[in-house]
Amino acid sequence: MGSRRAPSRGWGAGGRSGAGGDGEDDGPVWIPSPASRSYLLSVRPETSLSSNRLSHPSSGRSTFCSIIAQLTEETQPLFETTLKSRSVSEDSDVRFTCIVTGYPEPEVTWYKDDTELDRYCGLPKYEITHQGNRHTLQLYRCREEDAAIYQASAQNSKGIVSCSGVLEVGTMTEYKIHQRWFAKLKRKAAAKLREIEQSWKHEKAVPGEVDTLRKLSPDRFQRKRRLSGAQAPGPSVPTREPEGGTLAAWQEGETETAQHSGLGLINSFASGEVTTNGEAAPENGEDGEHGLLTYICDAMELGPQRALKEESGAKKKKKDEESKQGLRKPELEKAAQSRRSSENCIPSSDEPDSCGTQGPVGVEQVQTQPRGRAARGPGSSGTDSTRKPASAVGTPDKAQKAPGPGPGQEVYFSLKDMYLENTQAVRPLGEEGPQTLSVRAPGESPKGKAPLRARSEGVPGAPGQPTHSLTPQPTRPFNRKRFAPPKPKGEATTDSKPISSLSQAPECGAQSLGKAPPQASVQVPTPPARRRHGTRDSTLQGQAGHRTPGEVLECQTTTAPTMSASSSSDVASIGVSTSGSQGIIEPMDMETQEDGRTSANQRTGSKKNVQADGKIQVDGRTRGDGTQTAQRTRADRKTQVDAGTQESKRPQSDRSAQKGMMTQGRAETQLETTQAGEKIQEDRKAQADKGTQEDRRMQGEKGMQGEKGTQSEGSAPTAMEGQSEQEVATSLGPPSRTPKLPPTAGPRAPLNIECFVQTPEGSCFPKKPGCLPRSEEAVVTASRNHEQTVLGPLSGNLMLPAQPPHEGSVEQVGGERCRGPQSSGPVEAKQEDSPFQCPKEERPGGVPCMDQGGCPLAGLSQEVPTMPSLPGTGLTASPKAGPCSTPTSQHGSTATFLPSEDQVLMSSAPTLHLGLGTPTQSHPPETMATSSEGACAQVPDVEGRTPGPRSCDPGLIDSLKNYLLLLLKLSSTETSGAGGESQVGAATGGLVPSATLTPTVEVAGLSPRTSRRILERVENNHLVQSAQTLLLSPCTSRRLTGLLDREVQAGRQALAAARGSWGPGPSSLTVPAIVVDEEDPGLASEGASEGEGEVSPEGPGLLGASQESSMAGRLGEAGGQAAPGQGPSAESIAQEPSQEEKFPGEALTGLPAATPEELALGARRKRFLPKVRAAGDGEATTPEERESPTVSPRGPRKSLVPGSPGTPGRERRSPTQGRKASMLEVPRAEEELAAGDLGPSPKAGGLDTEVALDEGKQETLAKPRKAKDLLKAPQVIRKIRVEQFPDASGSLKLWCQFFNILSDSVLTWAKDQRPVGEVGRSAGDEGPAALAIVQASPVDCGVYRCTIHNEHGSASTDFCLSPEVLSGFISREEGEVGEEIEMTPMVFAKGLADSGCWGDKLFGRLVSEELRGGGYGCGLRKASQAKVIYGLEPIFESGRTCIIKVSSLLVFGPSSETSLVGRNYDVTIQGCKIQNMSREYCKIFAAEARAAPGFGEVPEIIPLYLIYRPANNIPYATLEEDLGKPLESYCSREWGCAEAPTASGSSEAMQKCQTFQHWLYQWTNGSFLVTDLAGVDWKMTDVQIATKLRGYQGLKESCFPALLDRFASSHQCNAYCELLGLTPLKGPEAAHPQAKAKGSKSPSAGRKGSQLSPQPQKKGLPSPQGTRKSAPSSKATPQASEPVTTQLLGQPPTQEEGSKAQGMR
């Protein structure tokens, strides 16, 4: 058995069953016969012992090798490849080739029929040669008499074997030549066609379809049967065998099938996912071809299934085990019995994923799982059920939203969840909050919960509204669930248990939730003092969840605005917090859903939601306030109502972006508090009670403060108390600190002032808005104002009529603040201006208190305290954003990250110092001290942060860094006052409330930039897309997740504290300080996380720079924060990097140092690399997508920010600098790994992993786990080795093997550090990983790396494919007489309303000629010239040349051929759809262009045909006409804005192609764009596209929203655009609005009629979106939901080139 054959024989064994362990390199080398193997096994222990004993491996190895040499001395002949039958026309040459192995070397004899052929005297008729073990019989100028059975017989001393092939010779007629050969083919094709058509629909929907398919092609089924149970799946292979006929291939297929019997289960599981995917419909055509695949090869079905298995194996297992155990068993049985049947059944639902979207499946699985769980409740059925119940319990709306928006939202939330997962970990609880509430309500304090819920839902008097919020929760829970699935492994039981699932899925969250909400419920009555003393998380949660009903509402309401700012991050937190306060949850969910699922809804219905949310919050606030304090309630209520009104109004204009933020802000404030609380709860379950008490106390204090503030508006003590309270609220996390906070109020205020100075906007405002009730309103108003200021452009409407004065004042304050920290006076004035000046006196008093910190700062600070006075009320809402927020941030951060936070605070303080000046500088430590002391005596930590805190610091540090960056960004934002950027900046960093509001709303886990992008999108109905575009690479997401987890903890604590301090939320600068940890432990974390996470890969130094740039970018995004704040920002950033470096180091110290073994294994490095890659895995898409969205919306902003460009660079860097990043990232990576370790399943698609990681990180166990991870990390047992496929196609197979895969993992292949594909691996799936290199050529030389990573770690192995290595393989056989093919045209019978169907097949023969250039896509496609012999008329005449293109790199799995065929099929089908659909669009464009006088010639996109080559291991390819000349690129996604040819310098064809792009973009409302065109003259090919939504018209792998945005911002109209009357594109912001406007669909009036087709197309799109069908109902909604889908699936789609997608799909 040759080494080559081993793999084909069985991947599992790699050719060697027992020898695998000792010599990694020996596997392929020796493949002994059974006898020798047995002998070897008995001998081996001695060898291995000796090698172990002698610390001299070489001696042991040599002994082992010598033994093997002896054992394998004599083996009987064996055909690695057998003869293939040929059918040729007369005068053609034929070559029969076989590869024979054996020892001694066999002697091969050739026979014609039964006559032996002379080895030496055959010429001129034939020639017998052999090269190595390859034996060839060449026949020249065949005649009919040469038709015969040719046989090769190999013999040696051990035996004799033979194989034969049939030669048919006929005249030049298709019929004669193929009478026999093609009769079979045609029958098969007919059956296949039927199968495809039926399987597309049936396979997905009907598992029983398998039977139908079988009935359709009984032959195949019977063949399978004959093959035997193990080979049952092999029938396709057998089918192929007759055609291509390689025994090895057949066996391999069998093996794969057999191996995949388990896959069936997984597939079955996946099927649910697939169904959930919603990709099924679009993939029907593609998947439908699964039937084709089935027909071609059950192997192919197996392949897709395997892909599913890999991708969702773990998940499937989870689901199967958890929910589908029953199904799984049957499936296993089925798999064993008729794996194919099982697979067919499973593929029917699973196939879409397996076939075309493994990558998507990963994400979708995550996504789908939630959905599936909801529907199925497999692994996460419990959680899902719980969530559903929660949704149902929460409110019908919630349930409704979950069902309808859920899928889309899930996708959207996927992103958020990815980022928020950490937060979300809690949030799922929050989401489940209703559930949790329900669950807890019974066991824990239903009263508290009910009140909370009643308050949030009932009190608001808008259950529906709360439901909205809650509805989003279900979505989030789904997302969470999606991410939870990774956890489900560990938490499968939990999933099963609604509550358990909730608690476990977001372990911390559940725990905190479970504890905190109950505590909250129970503790709602808890005195403020108690509240103060609760754990931060607990406090946050308790505060949010367990304030008095009024307080809760108040907090929620108040928090809502603040949360709005930090809504994203908070959303996650809120999810957790939900149990604490459903109202909070609802807002958060609402925001999340609105942001995500309802991104379109948000825009369209977001206002409603926002209004509802606002209402709820207004009502809730009013009621809550009333409940809490009549006095405060009235003042607050007014404020809140005004704020609420503002919010509700503002949501409409700004709500899409801000509504979620505000609503989310409220909900999120609580959520964040809850999140922080929950996370902290994880950390401090015990403290949770305290926290709850503290929360209560805080709330009570807040309430008291509010009351006191209201009662004693001007009382300094009250102010102080308020301040202190705020601090408490701010440092809800560190309630203990809260008491100290009062003393530190001054310092904190200064700190806040610092923040304010940097982000004066929000800071001053909130104070101004009012004392306590006022401050609450002020907070809301301030938040809004800040948002207005920060989000001014974005949320012009943010200013609510009720609070307009306040807003005005706030804005003024913000402006003043932006101008300088000296806004103290203005702040006071503004405070006075604030409509809610009832506490105005107190405000002034508060201001004086704040003055302690510094004049301006003091003023702001005062405001902060004042706001804090209102912590329960407005403060909570805005505290984060408010000055309090800042202190809270620092304190809250400190509390949140207590140790780390303090450290961060320290750094933050200095950073603030930079921005604010000495007062702040001195105060931050004080503040920190207060915070620290209160929290954990962290003050010392702040200055001399204790190592312990630092241990926690990794996340905190990251958060702080992120926050600092945000702060800088905010200050810049405030300074720039750029609305959009400011919004994000302020929202994200500057004003925690505003910033948090805006960005948070956008994407909890996304960076501010991303958030802003999302916000913009939300406004433009592109939130989902934006989120997707913003999708961080898995790496980034993971980082975000980790950061978010830590920050969520810190953030929740901070939120709790910030919540108290949120009243002053307006202080943008404060936000930075607060942002440091408070802004969003979720958001700042997210934003920072993104930057920081990305930075982390770069390393501490890089982190600093990267972060800086990222932050700067965000800040720039935030609106040209370059102005005043930028100086401090820069400094802060500079400091932050240093700190970051410090902290990362510290964090690293917390993490165990990488051991030499670990380094050797590359586990850590690789971990980071995978992350990097993951980031890159977004592949072009993720980096490009993220970057692109960043670029298009942020491109200008980036320019504003010094580091901005760096951010994309960083992202881009991920693949190229993968190693560097990983090295630098090591610390972070470790953290991430820890998070990942905690995260049950990174495989979930990276997003889940990230979320899971976050959740895991939330656990304090993260570090210990990290330590454990080294042992649990995957290990390499077989390095990459290269083999040749046995079909003489010239294709190579790279494969390697990993073991110790203890959890769901993601396996990534990269070439020269550029990701080319990725597949999921379920826990325990240790089969080989393979990458097929089609028709290997020198173009394919390079360094290939295979990396596997999961939460325990990562491992990778490299291989350099050099020309020398290539030369050792025999290139593709030349002199062939061609190959039989089936060619299928794609027909759009219904125009673009149709996603395309397949026309009648043509059967013919091609002769492949020389290989053309690497083709498009950086070598991802191979193009070769072919000559048509016959059979393709009328499309191609005989003798015509055409071009065959095939994907060059295909990632497949253990059941090699099967999976390989599936990937090959999916990629090829996508290519056909892309080009042919673009051709249809081009036809419409041509019709309109011709109608325009003087337009001239119009480009034409040539059709692409699908061909199937039965004899090829990689059978699917595309065929197109040969344009005769080298292609010229007319437009390319590779061109940057700068690289794009200028209109004047480009050719007419190029200009018209760009006009076509513009027309198409406008015609499809910005949802479809042709990105690449190359051609000759006016004929175009090599089409690449970008869609805004994943699954758009079935195009699953082409979702690149970033490219759409980039095009919108970079396209320069030319004369032809004007000729067609196209509206100039003003960037994505303008474009998206266009997209929103249905009327603007047709760029030209004439187009309206034709526009119907695109619309129907869109309608059709939903089918691809399957699950998202509800979204399609309204265009806006579908867009939003689809983008959400895109987001979730965005990364996989980037694999379009067959890279990542190949594996994922």
Swiss-Prot record:
Disulfide bonds join 1296-1346. Residues 1-10, 370-382, 557-579, 1120-1131 have a biased composition (Low complexity). It catalyses: L-seryl-[protein] + ATP = O-phospho-L-seryl-[protein] + ADP + H(+); L-threonyl-[protein] + ATP = O-phospho-L-threonyl-[protein] + ADP + H(+). Involved in cardiomyocyte differentiation. It comes from Homo sapiens (Human). The gene is ALPK3. InterPro entries: a-kinase_dom, Ig-like_dom, Ig-like_dom_sf, Ig-like_fold, Ig_I-set, Ig_sub, Ig_sub2, Kinase-like_dom_sf. Residues 211-221, 308-342, 647-657, 679-700, 829-844 have a biased composition (Basic and acidic residues). SMART domains: Alpha_kinase, IG, IGc2. The modification Phosphoserine is found at residues 228, 1222. It comes from the Eukaryota. Pfam families: Alpha_kinase, I-set. This is Alpha-protein kinase 3. Changing residue 231 to E: In a lung large cell carcinoma sample; somatic mutation. Residues 1390-1625 form the Alpha-type protein kinase domain. One of its GO terms (molecular function) is protein serine/threonine kinase activity. Residues 495-504, 598-609, 666-676, 708-729, 1664-1696 have a biased composition (Polar residues). Residues 1-33, 211-244, 308-749, 792-845, 1082-1145, 1173-1226, 1628-1705 are annotated as: Disordered. Residues 736-745 have a biased composition (Pro residues). It is linked to Cardiomyopathy, familial hypertrophic, 27: A form of hypertrophic cardiomyopathy, a heart disorder characterized by ventricular hypertrophy, which is usually asymmetric and often involves the interventricular septum. The symptoms include dyspnea, syncope, collapse, palpitations, and chest pain. They can be readily provoked by exercise. The disorder has inter- and intrafamilial variability ranging from benign to malignant forms with high risk of cardiac failure and sudden cardiac death. CMH27 is a severe, early-onset form with features of hypertrophic and dilated cardiomyopathy. Its EC number is 2.7.11.1. Keywords: Cardiomyopathy, Developmental protein, Disease variant, Disulfide bond, Immunoglobulin domain, Kinase, Nucleus, Phosphoprotein, Repeat, Serine/threonine-protein kinase, Transferase. GO terms for biological process: cardiac muscle cell development; heart development. GO terms for cellular component: nucleus. Gene3D superfamilies: Immunoglobulins, MHCK/EF2 kinase. Belongs to the protein kinase superfamily. Alpha-type protein kinase family. ALPK subfamily. Residues 11-21 have a biased composition (Gly residues).
